[in-house]
Amino acid sequence: MLKKYLFLTKPGILFGNFITTLGGFFLAAQGSIDILLLLLTLIGTTLVVASGCVVNNVIDQDIDTKMQRTQNRALVKKTISPTVALVYAFVLGVMGFSILWFGVNGYAFLFAMIGFIVYVGFYSLWTKRTSIHQTVIGSISGASPPVIGYTAVTHQFDVAALLLFLAYALWQMPHSWAIAIYRFDDYKNAGIPILPVARSIYRTKIECVIYILLFAAVLNGLYCFGYTNVFFLITFNALTAYWFYLSIIGFKAENDQLWAKRFFLYSVILITLLSLSFSFTYQSPAPNLPLF
């Protein structure tokens, strides 16, 4: 019984957002970790993300029946009712937002709210079914957790927070498209107008190259503005260079699905290593460049 409710929250997404929240927190903390604040930030963010994922499951019931990857979800199999799922999402959301508001700060609460509203409203209810730009919209919600982690410590939105937001949003474009290429038939059967389906796999590969270059350019800004050290500069660019290499060899791939799987898995490794590296690649003291 409990397993059904756990999988309703999409544990893979929870883990990914847990890591990126941790990364933002590490960068801001500069080695001085407030354990209680860290725990409250991680728990609050995870609960909010879990709430959004449960609501997404409710919204996507009709789509999930058409996709092999999602045909066994609890709402599709009707082992959990939509009403129970929404109550579950409400409880998770109330707990998560309360922790961020009362235990962290208004900035963390604000960016959690932005991420939730974009994911549930603008992505799940609207653009996922209607627009080729759905991934751009969805990337806003995916880029919120590192900013939540960062502002939990700094109590302000500064240049580093902006760079984190932009970089993590840019990373999500090729990451998400790789899933769509790997599961191309699923997305096509469900009628989801994501780029590989709505345009072509070749066009998607071109845009993956562009977004990887933009991702690298933006995140190098952390070093240029003095937020990270030279070790970050070297290791980040080495890791990203290999991702870029994978994007280039994709044009000669004999099997697009196998290439996309490899490309996707490396994107996960990259963002995980990047986020964890902020625990020791920060530059202290960091510049004070607040935006609001």
Curated annotation (Swiss-Prot):
InterPro entries: Protohaem_IX_farnesylTrfase, UbiA_prenyltransferase, UbiA_prenylTrfase_CS, UbiA_sf. The gene is cyoE. It is found in: Cell inner membrane. Its EC number is 2.5.1.141. Converts heme B (protoheme IX) to heme O by substitution of the vinyl group on carbon 2 of heme B porphyrin ring with a hydroxyethyl farnesyl side group. It catalyses: heme b + (2E,6E)-farnesyl diphosphate + H2O = Fe(II)-heme o + diphosphate. Carbon 2 of the heme B porphyrin ring is defined according to the Fischer nomenclature. Belongs to the UbiA prenyltransferase family. Protoheme IX farnesyltransferase subfamily. The chain crosses the membrane at residues 13-33, 35-55, 84-104, 106-126, 135-155, 161-181, 206-226, 231-251, 263-283. Pfam families: UbiA (PF01040). Its main location: membrane. This is Protoheme IX farnesyltransferase. The lineage of its organism: Bacteria, Pseudomonadati, Pseudomonadota, Gammaproteobacteria, Moraxellales. NCBIfam families: cyoE_ctaB, PRK04375.1-1. GO terms for cellular component: plasma membrane. The keyword DNA repair does not apply. It is a multi-pass membrane protein. Pathway: Porphyrin-containing compound metabolism; heme O biosynthesis; heme O from protoheme: step 1/1.
